[in-house]
From Swiss-Prot:
Residues exposed to the Cytoplasmic side: 41-67, 113-154, 218-224
GO cellular component, one term: ATP-binding cassette (ABC) transporter complex, substrate-binding subunit-containing
Organism ancestry: Bacteria, Pseudomonadati, Pseudomonadota, Gammaproteobacteria, Enterobacterales
Positions on the Periplasmic side per record topology: 1-19, 89-94, 176-196
InterPro entries linked: AA_ABC_transptr_permease_3TM (IPR010065), ArtM/GltK/GlnP/TcyL/YhdX-like (IPR043429), MetI-like (IPR000515), MetI-like_sf (IPR035906)
Topology versus the membrane: Multi-pass membrane protein
Organism: Escherichia coli (strain K12)
Protein name: Glutamate/aspartate import permease protein GltK
Keyword terms: Amino-acid transport, Cell inner membrane, Cell membrane, Membrane, Transmembrane, Transmembrane helix, Transport
Gene name tied to this protein: gltK
Membrane-spanning intervals of the chain: 20-40, 68-88, 95-112, 155-175, 197-217
Length: 224
């Protein structure tokens, strides 16, 4: 019968916390940039100017049709060359974390865009017409009238997508980036406690995701 050995967890906590910080950095960065870029894409897709709408639609369709792990690898290969040529960074600089942040931000923006677009379309067109009648421009009505109402209703959905993003960050193992999951796995391989460390990592992901889910449920009740 297998005997669990949890003794390596406590001594490894500093390394695990460092890995968790990297995971949270990727998550927070991708959520913030993803929502900002996703909002722009949503507005562009609703534009009456066809080329702009086509670009936004093509962007969303492309990123939603490609596996995330492939996007991570693409940006891992593209971003270093871009930064070296534009910013003059040395090839020796480790920019795996930046590559991961860019990849997740661009990928998640496609999903946030659809959430935000649906939120905008849920607002009565009468409000936009009333704003235009008062002398506001289209962009002013979008900024001051439509988006604030749409975001209030969308907060639970945006946070839910953020939870999915947090769980997906474990895929950065393909970049050999020492996030929380990879750190736990590496420690398990080193100490011969692979099962225990993976179970512990899963428990931490569960606790954080459950806490965030409870927050989402609370916000849903508040915004209902």
């Amino acid at each position: 019968m297998y005997e669990f050995d949890w003794s390596s967890i406590v001594p490894s906590l500093p390394y695990l916390l460092d890995g968790l910080v990297i995971t949270l950095k990727i998550t927070v960065t991708a959520v913030v940039i993803g929502i900002l870029w996703g909002t722009m894409l949503a507005v562009m897709r609703l534009s009456s100017f066809a080329p702009v709408a086509w670009f936004a639609k093509a962007y969303v369709n492309v990123f939603r049709s490609i596996p995330l792990v492939m996007v991570l690898l693409w940006f891992y290969l593209i971003v270093p060359g871009f930064l070296q040529n534009v910013l003059g960074l040395s090839p020796k600089n480790d920019i795996r974390l930046i590559s991961a942040m860019v990849a997740f931000s661009m990928f998640e923006a496609a999903y946030y865009s659809e959430i935000i677009r649906a939120g905008i379309q849920s607002i009565s067109r009468g409000q936009s017409s009333a704003a235009l009648a008062l002398g506001m421009t289209h962009w002013q009505s979008m900024k001051l009238i439509i988006l604030p109402q749409a975001f209030r209703a969308m907060v639970p959905l945006l946070l839910t997508q953020g939870i999915v993003l947090f769980q997906d960050t474990s895929l950065v193992y393909v970049l050999s980036l020492a996030d929380f999951f990879r750190t736990a796995s590496t420690i398990g391989e080193r100490d011969g406690t692979q099962v225990e460390m993976i179970l512990f990592a899963g428990f931490v992901y569960f606790v954080i995701s459950l806490s965030a889910s409870l927050l989402v449920s609370y916000l849903k009740r508040r915004t209902a």
